[in-house]
């Protein structure tokens, strides 16, 4: 959703689901690690942190641009292909939401309808770390 990075969540059930999904797709052993995030990360003025409080036009465009392999404006603030953001926080676009995104990109609904529909879906959270500077604030528990 937010570009190539190390993804975490505050929701254990979501972490377990995603671990299972990775094992089904790639094989291996299902593993869920627990980390503690040092809150001082939000005081570090050298980090570029992007936070989406909930579904919004900006959030939807950001995810669409990160998932679009043909998106060329990687320096745009509307994507993170170049890891301009050290940390991005916001809702997860789950499989139901992906169907809505496709409906939008195919021109069958407008952006306002997309956002309205997203607010009725069960949303989860994700923290995506994109640089070593941001990762230093994570500690294994």
Regions found by a protein language model. Give the residues of each.
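A short, exposed loop/beta-hairpin motif centered on an aromatic-Gly-Thr core
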Residues: 2-7
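Conserved NAD+-utilizing ADP-ribose enzyme module
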Residues: 1, 17, 21-141
């Amino acid at each position: 959703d937010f570009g190539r990075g190390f993804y975490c969540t505050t929701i254990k059930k979501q972490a377990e689901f995603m671990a299972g999904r990775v094992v089904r797709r790639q094989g291996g052993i299902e593993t869920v690690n627990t980390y503690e995030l040092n809150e001082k990360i939000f005081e570090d003025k050298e980090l570029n942190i992007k936070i989406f409080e909930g579904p919004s036009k900006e959030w939807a465009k950001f995810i669409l641009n990160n998932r679009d392999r043909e998106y060329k404006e990687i320096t745009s603030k509307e994507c993170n292909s170049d890891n301009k953001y050290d940390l991005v926080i916001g809702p997860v676009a789950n499989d139901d939401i992906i169907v809505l995104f496709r409906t939008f990109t195919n021109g069958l609904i407008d952006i306002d309808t997309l956002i309205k529909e997203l607010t009725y879906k069960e949303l989860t959270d994700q923290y995506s770390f994109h640089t070593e500077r941001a990762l230093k604030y994570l500690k294994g528990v």
